[in-house]
């Protein structure tokens, strides 16, 4: 077997051209050979040859780059095979060779011309390779005419990255390289946990009583921002429900707070505020099919509500880009979504009666039903108050307020950007509106904006300790935005990736990879999904070539832990995910996702255990990497809502109601690194969100220059640190000094022990307490074998109150592209 080596770092690849490509003729496509005929006769011959080749090849040839089985790049399609195209590729793959494949595009798929190979043993040295490679057929023989492909390859090992393992070092740190949006200095950032925080919830304090974090209230601040807008309100969402009420806390009323979202937006439009909405068009929501659609996003209802009003609401399908084949185009249009959740408004400027500023919101929370929740995450106690008209429980058949709880609690994270980065969120909306809205029609022009707003300049002075530096990232392609350059060289210069005949931005995945590589001490993740790096999965019972869940984040995390074990340094990773993905837990789609998740975990724990053994350490892998979920269990209370109906006997619904427990659904999309850097957005840690050509996403990465590991060699104690402590207080209901050093064995073991105890209380057949569950952070119910294999926790084959397997089950009929 050919030797495999770990290629962990960055590949710089340039594909130039093919020297000649014969096809039943002595002439070649590129016009290069031993003799160059001249004259009108020869020109006629060449024209006939070109016409015949266009017929044979469709006039469209492209090349791909594979790391063994993993496709990492592809060129644009060209009539003649001369690309001159460069690629910046992050790698974390154990491979034997780099494969360059030349294909002819066809309407349905593509046909193979040939492949060229470059052994990893040559690449891994780091020396530049500039070479003509033989193009071979499937039997490894030169194709007709002995054609060659000209490539240049340069590998840089991850340890040679100037930021590797160093955190953020100023002034040299310039943000994530090769990204579409640059990092913006002098911003303000507001961080939100959940849609609302009650007055009774305490501020976060350190030992000695020092207040380090005051809570902000997401939906109230969104309401205020919309209410106070004078010129523009731009909303993009996966789901927008006109019936939701943003302000519900009776102790925090305000003028207009009783308005529903739809009423509020119509009111603002009547005040001559430009209100534009981009709502994902669920292709399954159609009068002919099911009006609310398979995803129940209310898109058609929202569109109908605003019809013939001053609010401009556009339903946006996830249109395929021009480079997709018919099959790929069908996949994109029917399987993928517009998943961004953004709001852009104008807001007042202190000290100015005429000028306004741009403020943007982004994150995981859609403006729709089921999202309003507090850090208490009640199951039954609010069904006769704030959730009486907002009962959300999609995990049980027939669930409704009439049959009672448990409702599905919702944990999420969002943020507000103020300053130059807020404008990048505005630009994103404008690009999307021009592509799928109404062109420039209805958008406030840049000239008008210049008259009514202050320019996108820093709003915080460099010496202000509360200042932020922010960079906006996306997963998106030119099927969804206007303005991406067609020339691949121009696209590459602004951080874009050129595909067959499309242009992709994949900067969210790049942001995660860079942040993980910079990490020194710990990583804390909350995400709705956690699966990927399928190139590293065990292939004993699956064909890895069919999975294509290639995003690098899980492998980058396990390799970071391995590097720390090898160096004899502490490093801890905490990952919070839902108990299962939203939906019927025993359904084929949920079980398939859980199977991918289990394989991802297994790959990571295998890497860690191998590294521990090499160092002669008999350590628990959960001291380095640990997974959690959230759940609640409530005791009945006097005056609680009494449903007039009952769930079907012996159903999951009935059992959950009897046991009075249910998972808290983790919908967050957040990563904190070393308490100095945070990523928040709409992107899940799966292929759909990180691909760029699948679901469209937006995120931001941010830090406070005055609160870095490199500042005075002290631990950061800025807003990111405080936000993490606040989240841990929400989940664990306690704070301790150990939480200030998450990488320590003391901290991770304390958190694991508490979560183990809480899982025991949550899963117990008979609940032994007379009060609610004393914390929400539960150990994910898996067991880790001696070689890294992941199985269900002993005695927990199925999720509580269900017959659904904890570790999932491979689907034999659902396409992996749908569930990965």
From Swiss-Prot:
It is a peripheral membrane protein. Expressed in buds, flowers, siliques, stems, old leaves and roots. Expressed in the sieve elements. InterPro entries: C2_dom, C2_domain_sf, PLipase_D/transphosphatidylase, PLipase_D_C, PLipase_D_fam, PLipase_D_pln. SMART domains: C2 (SM00239), PLDc (SM00155). Disruption phenotype: No visible phenotypes when grown under normal conditions, but increased sensitivity to salinity and water deficiency. Late flowering in slightly dry conditions. Decreased sensitivity to glucose. Keywords: Calcium, Cytoplasm, Hydrolase, Lipid degradation, Lipid metabolism, Membrane, Metal-binding, Repeat. Its cofactor is Ca(2+). Its EC number is 3.1.4.4. It catalyses: a 1,2-diacyl-sn-glycero-3-phosphocholine + H2O = a 1,2-diacyl-sn-glycero-3-phosphate + choline + H(+). Its main location: cytoplasm. GO terms for biological process: membrane lipid catabolic process; phosphatidylcholine metabolic process; response to abscisic acid; response to salt stress; response to water deprivation. It is an enzyme of class 3 (hydrolase). This is Phospholipase D alpha 3. The lineage of its organism: Eukaryota, Viridiplantae, Streptophyta, Embryophyta, Tracheophyta.
